[in-house]
């Protein structure tokens, strides 16, 4: 099976309150940068053939050195990201389209992942890739622990309470049949329509495409706020302990 991966890693960590637009991908958890953990997971996933990363210009040489020093051979290209997350993914998509045209080989699936989600596991990546190839689309998610409410017309007053049993918190990597994801990004670019994730693009332009749910654990967090670094240390320790038992 051939899976191609795009990692969006251009976040500057505004909510992390980092100085000088520093990349949150370089924050250390367990003595290694966040992006190191992310690269390692995809390197170890058996279904993954190549990985394209979009990041900040200043991070490109640093990321390349991390990949080289650690033998992350599946990292195919590390390029400059765009203004928005969707633009960054689009930049990688252009390279993937060129590779498809040159090789004449269509991947079985394309996965899109947030670089700031360092705890996705290789076996989960493989599961999502296979389900994406089989069903055309697959997105990981977790059940919310908290009650979710709408905000009312008055932004200081709650509206209705949502039925938590029908809600899921969506994560990445999100996997898709390559042709549909490529076309969805092309159409969104023409329309200048931006979404917060790739599943929303596929939902908009291919409403007939069912998206398979892949329920993950609560370890696959996105490093977004300062508290997440401390939570990440605990998650990493738990993952290591679980692996040592096995």
From Swiss-Prot:
SUPFAM superfamilies linked to this entry: Nucleotide-diphospho-sugar transferases (SSF53448)
Enzymatic class: transferase
InterPro entries noted in UniProt: IspD, IspD/TarI, IspD/TarI_cytidylyltransf_bact, ISPD_synthase_CS, Nucleotide-diphossugar_trans
E.C. number: 2.7.7.60
Pathway assigned to this chain's UniProt record: Isoprenoid biosynthesis; isopentenyl diphosphate biosynthesis via DXP pathway; isopentenyl diphosphate from 1-deoxy-D-xylulose 5-phosphate: step 2/6
Superkingdom in the source lineage: Bacteria
GO molecular function: 2-C-methyl-D-erythritol 4-phosphate cytidylyltransferase activity
Keywords for this protein: Isoprene biosynthesis, Nucleotidyltransferase, Transferase
Protein task: Catalyzes the formation of 4-diphosphocytidyl-2-C-methyl-D-erythritol from CTP and 2-C-methyl-D-erythritol 4-phosphate (MEP).
Family: Belongs to the IspD/TarI cytidylyltransferase family. IspD subfamily.
The protein's name: 2-C-methyl-D-erythritol 4-phosphate cytidylyltransferase
Taxonomic source organism: Chlorobaculum tepidum (strain ATCC 49652 / DSM 12025 / NBRC 103806 / TLS) (Chlorobium tepidum)
Organism taxonomic ancestry: Bacteria, Pseudomonadati, Chlorobiota, Chlorobiia, Chlorobiales
């Amino acid at each position: 099976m051939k899976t191609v991966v795009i990692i969006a890693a251009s976040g500057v960590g505004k909510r992390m309150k980092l100085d000088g637009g520093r990349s949150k991908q370089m924050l250390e958890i367990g003595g290694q940068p966040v992006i190191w953990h992310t690269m390692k997971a995809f390197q170890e996933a058996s279904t993954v053939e190549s990985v394209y990363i979009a990041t900040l210009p200043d991070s490109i040489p640093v990321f390349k050195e991390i990949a080289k020093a650690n033998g992350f051979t599946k990292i195919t290209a590390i390029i400059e990201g765009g203004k928005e997350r969707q633009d960054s993914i689009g930049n990688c998509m252009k390279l993937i389209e060129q590779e498809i045209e040159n090789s004449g080989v269509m991947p079985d699936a394309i996965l899109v992942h947030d670089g700031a989600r360092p705890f996705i596991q290789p076996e989960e990546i493989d599961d999502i890739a296979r389900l994406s190839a089989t069903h055309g689309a697959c997105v990981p998610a977790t059940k919310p622990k908290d009650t979710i409410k709408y905000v009312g017309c008055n932004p200081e007053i709650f509206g209705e309470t949502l039925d938590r049993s029908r809600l899921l918190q969506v994560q990445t990597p999100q996997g898709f049949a390559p042709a549909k994801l490529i076309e969805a990004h092309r159409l969104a670019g023409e329309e200048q329509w931006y979404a917060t994730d790739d599943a929303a693009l596929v939902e908009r332009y291919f409403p007939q495409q069912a998206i398979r749910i892949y329920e993950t654990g609560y370890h696959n967090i996105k490093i977004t706020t300062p508290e997440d670094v401390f939570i990440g240390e605990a998650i990493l320790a738990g993952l290591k302990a679980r692996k040592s038992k096995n």
